[in-house]
Amino acid sequence: MTIVGLVIQQHDGTILFQNVREYLSLDKAHLAAKAFKNQISSYDENFITKGSISHLTGSVVVLNMYRVYYMILNELFILAISQANDNPFEGSIYLARAKRVLWSVSKDFTTTQINKKYTEVYFALERVLFGEDGVEVLSQKISEVSPHQPPHYNTHHHTSTPSVAPSFITGGSTTPPPITIFGRLIEPNQSNSLSNSISNSNSNNNNNNNNDSININSINSNIYQTTVPLTLSNVLNSSNFNNNNNNNNNNNNNNNNSNNSLNNSNSNSNIISPSSSSGNLSSFNNNNNNEEYNNYNNNYNSLDNSYSLQFESLMRLEQSNIPEKIFTQPNTLPKIDKHIYDPPQTIKWGNPSVSHIGSSASSTRVTNRIMFTLRHPNAGKEAKEKEKEKENEFKEQQEINNMNNNNNGANGNSGGSGNVIIGSAAAGSASSKSSPSTSPLSSSYNPSSPETSENSFSATPISDSNSLKNSIDNNNNNNNNNNNNNNSGDTPETPKRKFSLSMGTFNNSKSSLSTSNSNISTPDNGASSPLASSTSGSASSAAAPPPVPLTNSAKTKMNFLNF
């Protein structure tokens, strides 16, 4: 998917919606939208108010990096951002879907009506950006579209108290209602309800101290409105049910104080509990109440421990520090070796185009494209001048050889009889050119060779001197043509060009000169023909030019495109 950003922008440059994918940041999308506005303004001042509609859709490359597909509506621009080298027709479907979303909200494409359903349009464009049709979002409820908000927690949890007193205070058999703390419902155990006999303590006892004791019967639901947190265990430990300053205690009170003191050192409670109020705690003057009070003490400890475990876990969760990087997305994503836009791996010119994932170098989008180097016409000026000098020297030497061949042919014909010619010119040219002998009188004569079939040997008497001269000239011309054909590989003629696209060099393991000269056979000087022996001595003075030596280190340009 090439579209990495959708922007809804007003004609004055105000951005209404800006949806981006992970490959494009919000800052870059903003810069691309701003550059688009500046670019179309520089094209024509009346760009928006033109009469024709051909300009209402199109694509523009901005910042030399991004291609912006645009659609001009009544008051808005719809911009789809992609990479600069993507297909220019790629973003048309995104523009059509985004236009459909805006049209379903406002038929006139006005900004005020679109802003009324800002959230629905935002999530609809988000779906359009990921390749879906976003119109169905507009028919859904907002709770189904947007992510659910977390519940609102009361941060002042130490002041929130239950509205009903728990059963271990009132002595009721009903279970206290659950308490909502940190958004969780905490329900106490069913075993926390105590018997009603605890509240039926002896309230008629005269041994009451107003300052040093607590009257359980005086505690009612009104104490839960206080804001000072104090655990009941600490209150009971502070009183200890002992009154050392009271001199009016009887024996029953002394026994009760010694046997029924509360020792709740093992309970470290963090529960919310009522504060102490001014009241009296009556002493138990009957031994029958000892068992009931012990049951009350055990049940209270179990309740205190269960609450402490639940609150400790919650407090530990509340005090834990969560790093901020969990809630924030990094500005730059980690780069991977194989990007999502990379082409598949192909092999051209002997090398893989796309590097493997394990390689250190990361691939790019143009790895499978051949990069050419443009050579200037004067790039190899010195090499060209040297080639021309060698070519001129070779042509001069070739002209000298042709003149010698013509002279040798004339001398050979003057020494024989004027009535019969048996390939005299061919024999003379063969010795000077060091080519295979085609004379039927030589020892190396092969009647099946193509050279023999090509050269016509006439044994008929010719009396006309003009005809003899014409035949000699024709044979010399044929030999000169063969000489040029054999040496055609020595002087490669390259066409004149303005410039060329070249790629790479290669080494010459064997030059064309060495291969062509190695296949040339030497003439047979020991021929039985007196005509051939007479011409060989005079032709030995004009030998073939030596080949130009080329080393293996010499390099030749491979020009495959000529202009």
UniProtKB/Swiss-Prot annotation:
Oligomer and partners: Component of the TSET complex, a heterohexamer composed of tstA, tstB, tstC, tstD, tstE and tstF, which may act in plasma membrane turnover. tstA, tstB, tstC and tstD are likely to be the core complex members with tstE and tstF acting as associated scaffold proteins.
Name recorded for this polypeptide: TSET complex member tstC
InterPro entries: Longin-like_dom_sf
Annotated region described as Disordered, given as residue ranges: 146-170, 192-213, 235-298, 376-395, 428-563
Organism for this UniProt entry: Dictyostelium discoideum
Disulfide bridge positions per record: none
Residue spans of biased composition, Polar residues class: 460-473, 552-563
Biased composition (Low complexity): 428-459, 474-487, 507-543
Chain intervals with Basic and acidic residues compositional bias: 379-395
